[in-house]
């Protein structure tokens, strides 16, 4: 079963949107297999956003992610990576469709509430950065028979 990494960023935590975000993923039929509220070290933030290290916003992005707790999550389900990206919406909340998390709650690119892995390979890398295997629970929700053929 496919897995993805989702992080509710400091602005989402501070605005009290954790339950709303989790509810949307649950309503979509995905299974939560890892969850933790945590303060992010500068080293972890830099490693996570390594792909952006040459971009002018890298320093402020790292500083922002370290500024307040985040909620790190691993979700599981058929096609969860692509489906989660649609649920999250465009990076710029002003371009995000209504009904998406960013479209409904996002304010600006720099405060766009949530991060989601953009590919299966990226998800695997990010999950291993934020979680060890013992922190992930494999379980079978009873609703699964009502979601998948």
Swiss-Prot record:
Keywords: ATP-binding, Cytoplasm, Kinase, Magnesium, Metal-binding, Nucleotide metabolism, Nucleotide-binding, Phosphoprotein, Transferase. Gene3D superfamilies: Nucleoside diphosphate kinase-like domain. It is found in: Cytoplasm. Its EC number is 2.7.4.6. Its main location: cytoplasm. ATP binds at residues 9, 57, 85, 91, 102, 112. GO terms for biological process: CTP biosynthetic process; GTP biosynthetic process; UTP biosynthetic process. The keyword ATP-binding applies. It catalyses: a 2'-deoxyribonucleoside 5'-diphosphate + ATP = a 2'-deoxyribonucleoside 5'-triphosphate + ADP; a ribonucleoside 5'-diphosphate + ATP = a ribonucleoside 5'-triphosphate + ADP. GO terms for molecular function: ATP binding; metal ion binding; nucleoside diphosphate kinase activity. It comes from the Bacteria. One of its GO terms (cellular component) is cytoplasm. Its cofactor is Mg(2+). Homotetramer. Major role in the synthesis of nucleoside triphosphates other than ATP. The ATP gamma phosphate is transferred to the NDP beta phosphate via a ping-pong mechanism, using a phosphorylated active-site intermediate. Belongs to the NDK family. This is Nucleoside diphosphate kinase.
């Amino acid at each position: 079963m496919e897995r993805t990494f989702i992080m509710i960023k400091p602005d989402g935590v501070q605005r009290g949107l954790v339950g709303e975000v989790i509810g949307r993923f649950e309503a979509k039929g995905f299974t939560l297999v890892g969850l933790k509220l945590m303060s992010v070290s500068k080293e972890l933030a830099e490693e996570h956003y390594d792909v952006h290290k040459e971009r002018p916003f890298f320093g402020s992005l790292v500083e922002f992610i370290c500024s307040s707790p985040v909620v790190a999550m691993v979700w599981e389900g058929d096609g969860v990576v692509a489906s989660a990206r649609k649920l999250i919406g465009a990076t710029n909340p002003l371009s995000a469709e209504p009904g998406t998390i960013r479209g409904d709650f996002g304010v600006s690119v720099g405060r766009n509430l949530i991060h989601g892995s953009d590919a299966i390979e990226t998800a695997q890398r990010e999950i291993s950065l934020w979680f060890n295997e013992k922190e992930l629970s494999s379980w079978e929700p009873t609703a699964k028979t009502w979601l998948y053929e």
